[in-house]
Amino acid sequence: MNIERADFVDRVKIFVKAGDGGNGCVSFRREKYVPKGGPDGGDGGNGGFVFLRANPSVSTLIEFVNKRKFMAENGKHGMGKKMKGRNGKDLFIDVPVGTVVKDAVTGEVIADLNEPGKIVCVARGGRGGRGNAHFATSIKQAPLIAERGEKGESRWLELELKILADVGLVGYPNVGKSSLISRISNARPKIANYPFTTLIPNLGVVKYDDFSFVVADIPGLIEGASEGVGLGNVFLRHVERCYLIAHVIDVSGYEREDPVRDYFVIREEMKKYSPFLLEKPEIVVANKIDLIGKEELEKILKRLRDATNREVIPVSAVTGEGIDLLVSKLASIVREMKVEKPERKEEKFVKPSPVWRRLPEKFHLEVVKEDEGYWVVEGENLRVWIERFDLNQRDARLMLLQVLEKNGLNNKLKEAGVKEGDVVRIGDFEFEYRE
């Protein structure tokens, strides 16, 4: 799996907005030869939800560079004859397997889409408003009231791709990681004799007998990468999911003078990125052994083994010497670790309920003077009522005023200094105050 640098994007921000619920309908049945009429306003449809779905056929987040806003469909309004409005269509957004979804404002991790087909809801649609058929009572048989649909949820998300690989190749630039992955797998990365030839991670599938595993070639690290030197250390996020780290060292002495120092410099950069990486199983791959004498090689290998306390496998990515042993060792470790990993039970996806806020019955009201003789009634719980109902509807207005009066609206108006004839606004509705 080779991806061109221009197409490789592993971190983006997107905006998602679920659909609003449709409004309920105010309607009355008036049909010839139908003896019983009455309210028959239908409910509004629910707004569409927004889901993210892990799709194996998507490899990068490039699609989100030019399109960053995604909106699901609104629910349709209710109609007469108790006809419910159609629900808005849900929106499914495909992302690469291995995408971590975060709330862009809080940084909270919402989901880790680390398995093909895994789905997460990132914005719930609003529930449709109820039509006036729901508000008929024995006392009020012809209600002029219906609910507005709830607003759908919206949020900014940060999507971060962490490639799924079993083995991660790390090391200085130009130590032969790309040559190595092309030798052991089906990957065909760009290979050249200069630093930072590899600018993006390359993935390759390695086959060993009846077993196969994925290796990732991570762009080279250098001292100071955690401070942004070179390509920085951001690509180390793609090692976080690996079972095993293969630390590639150039032991030829031509470009890198001290392989032991190189090893610890890279380890320090890994630690600065995430101490968790140092806890992963690791083997050291001593590359370019074809460019050094046997006696000198043995001294270097001993130094590496003593200093790192790791298994060191000498190889030549050019001649192929030691490659079979390396592949055998990688396959053995990965196979063992996959067996040890408990099998994850498949989670059944359950669509959540649409957004629907209960109508509060208690209010903390504030009366604010905006101008001479002009007042505004405010309150957190009051906002739910204002958004739910059209206060130009007589019965909606009367119902709200009754609830407000129970919460001491009249006393609040007097305490604030509202006089007879002053204008009071609640939401979009204005009325003249009378004692």
Swiss-Prot record:
A GO biological process of this protein is:
ribosome biogenesis
Amino-acid positions noted as binding GTP in the UniProt annotation, renumbered to this chain? 171-178, 196-200, 217-220, 287-290, 316-318
Task: State the compartments where it is located.
Answer: Cytoplasm
* Stretches assigned to the Obg domain: 6-164
Q: List, in alphabetical order, the Gene Ontology terms for molecular function in this entry.
A: GTP binding; GTPase activity; magnesium ion binding
Q: Pfam families attached here?
A: DUF1967, GTP1_OBG, MMR_HSR1
Do you know which Gene3D superfamilies this protein is assigned to?
A: GTP-binding protein OBG, C-terminal domain (3.30.300.350), GTP1/OBG domain (2.70.210.12), P-loop containing nucleotide triphosphate hydrolases (3.40.50.300)
Sequence ranges assigned to domain OCT in this UniProt record: 357-435
Q: What is this protein called?
A: GTPase Obg
